[in-house]
Amino acid sequence: MEADWRRIDIDAFDPESGRLTAADLVPPYETTVTLQELQPRMNQLRSLATSGDSLGAVQLLTTDPPYSADAPTKEQYFKSVLEALTQVRQADIGNVIKNLSDSQRDVLVKYLYKGMSVPQGQKQGGVLLAWLERITQVSGVTPIVHYISDRRTV
């Protein structure tokens, strides 16, 4: 059954029309992830990063990100992510990115942009830009387009 495209109310989808609220734009989540649930994962992330297993650390942080967590929990988790990303040697970044799946690269780009938008990440701007440069060399701009179009935040 086809929808009559002439009868679609496009103003209902315009965020500036006043019909949509900020809550309407947030994707629904079934459960909320707490800091206590993420703590073992954060500890594992730190131990992988400090032991030199950069591929394992980046794969862990890009697999199943805590989209449904509240803002303070996401911030605590992001600190662990930033620690892990900054401990990877510049020479290893390309190999790590090549071993990630497309969806993991998309999540990594979300963390990189988040890092560039917060003060603790801006201090590591050169490292974050090196990661972003290598991602665009491997995948092109596709992960950046996915970051822009995805409503889920890390």
From Swiss-Prot:
GO terms for cellular component: actin cortical patch; actin cytoskeleton; Arp2/3 protein complex; cytoplasm. Transmembrane segments: none annotated. It is found in: Cytoplasm, Cytoskeleton, Actin patch. Its main location: cytoplasm. GO terms for molecular function: actin filament binding; mRNA binding; protein-macromolecule adaptor activity. GO terms for biological process: actin cortical patch organization; actin nucleation; Arp2/3 complex-mediated actin nucleation; mitochondrion inheritance; regulation of actin filament polymerization. Functions as a component of the Arp2/3 complex which is involved in regulation of actin polymerization and together with an activating nucleation-promoting factor (NPF) mediates the formation of branched actin networks. This is Actin-related protein 2/3 complex subunit 5. It comes from Saccharomyces cerevisiae (strain ATCC 204508 / S288c).
